[in-house]
């Protein structure tokens, strides 16, 4: 998407006009204009020259963002968002108010309340009129922008809010000038009655008051709109301006734009990390709250990644730059927030269509109103006042701002809490989700095996069991071994050196320690070599039913104990799932694990449905099936989740994830917390509710205000509306809409107390993708391989990947509990190749059947 700066827009009708003009350019596939940020996003093959020309022909200015430099600095981008409008409006308002007070003194103070005037004004009605003409003229010159913009838009046949203001004010002024000249004629003729009558036809104060009140509203609106971009501006302010890099062994401070990939930079305690990088020397605690919203510092050491704008709280670190400029995490976040602001939510299209015809319709109504009152026998001044009231009370901005201000504030709220909506569409649609599909590994669980249980045999301590396992597993490369090593190291245990280490077929290890033979492995492996007490055997079975992998250890033929390892559920996962269910959302867990393990983990997490045996390539088809039953959000963090994230109605990438997952997602959660999923949906619902409130107010205001201004209720109730009060109402309408949107800043996205409890959907029925294919492919050869050595889901995934790569099979299903790998092939497969493939993956084949 190419971004453009747009100048000259003043209301929703302007943005609608620009969008319509650019959409007609050949090669443009989509265009969205943001009145809040005065920007435009365009997709397609059209040249920037054609696009800019189209904008200019519509009566506005345009320039391609970053066209003058290869890279726009963060300070320049920040400057572009600065509120330059409010100070200018404030100066205009102060000057206008000063002259308006004097004008009101002359026009109403003397006549209504008898306030004193200089003697030369006594009975000098022409002088009174000339003073009012002069003062009103000065105020019109001060607020000339309304007239320039309004009549320019009218000339281009795209009238906007400024056109309504300019027409209303100018009509009052022109009629008053006519009345002044007519009064001078009457005074020359000595017709004092006519003179007094024409004095009552002066609307100079209305012409000036309309402009002043609209300026008040514009200033309040600009101030409020400025606050809607606070989140984006605060993100930009986080970007460091300089970096300290090492060149020839010397520290040199350079502008951030000069840092290149591969440069080595240093960061002292209290300083911000300038760019994304990897620590090559030193340790520290890094405060990443700027990016993730998480206030607790994260310990970092050599080899760990650091991100721009995070704060080094302790320790001197030396880092190598890996991402600079627009590639840093901070820059990508800012780009996502900016792009979201430049897109339009589907609900905004209603307001856009209305805004496009609103101003011409209002002008037509004003003309008809004036004519009708003239035809009913009223004086021209009275009829004109009704028409002017219609012009100045009508507010297209209230309609046009209803959606974008809420989207901008909601998006900013999300960004402050580490929740990034990539488009306005994703912010609107996330709240409509009915089914949430969660990838198990890395989403519900931590993604890394951990030690969960230590069960020593009689007479053996936990420390003794863990030390022995530590010594035995230290030389193993298995993922489960790493879990035991990490647990032991966290307890500051020391592993004695073993000799004669062997990885044995059938899920086992052996070694010698102090002339004692140590063995470890699966239940099946150990039970074939030593006697396992019935109590421990039952306990191992219970652990397996809970989705854990029991590892047994023996010394000199006697069982020492059991260590259970599992990919544990994240601390906040059950609560997050419960919150989703309370919101009326059905939660489904997708996993490649076998049915038994999947059911155990699903029960612990509290999900509604479990779909087991789902291959990486099968997630997309499962999502397609779920979409037939409701609007689906897919939550994942890996490369193999990308197709499913794309297929879902809303794709949510959780945690740091991968670049591919982030690219495929609609919503990016910076933290690895599942609780941010209900928070994102909650924020979406609150934003959508706010939009509905804004649209209701905007339509209600115009529906009630225009008939009142036109005088519809005069024959019934005698209600009339002075043009000045109409202008005041117009000023406040947009302000009310923007202020209502700003209430979202007070919304607590993690507060589940006010969640609307919707009746849950009916049970979800999704057939296992493998079973579907098995039925469809009865003519295929089913290959069942007996495999020794698989101990967990990680082993299964390893074997699946090896078989898939070697034979092109798409439906490989492995089970470490059954020690089998099953897949289908169009014809019988070379069994020697199967054995070689499995052996190369680190496992042994004990049998093959093909049928």
Walk through the language-model features, giving the residues of each.
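Conserved ATP-binding TGD loop and adjacent catalytic N/P-domain core of P-type ATPases
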Residues: 16, 29, 433, 513-515, ...
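Flexible metal-binding regulatory segments at protein termini and peripheral loops
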Residues: 1-127, 250-253, 331, 335-343, ...
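Conserved cytosolic catalytic loops of P-type ATPases
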Residues: 26-43, 48-49, 201-202, 233-327, ...
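Membrane-embedded alpha-helical bundles of multi-pass transporters
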Residues: 112-126, 155, 174, 413, ...
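Juxtamembrane coupling segments of multi-pass membrane pumps/enzymes
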Residues: 77, 183-187, 192-193, 208-269, ...
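Transmembrane helix-loop-helix hairpins at the membrane interface
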Residues: 88-242, 353, 454, 718-723, ...
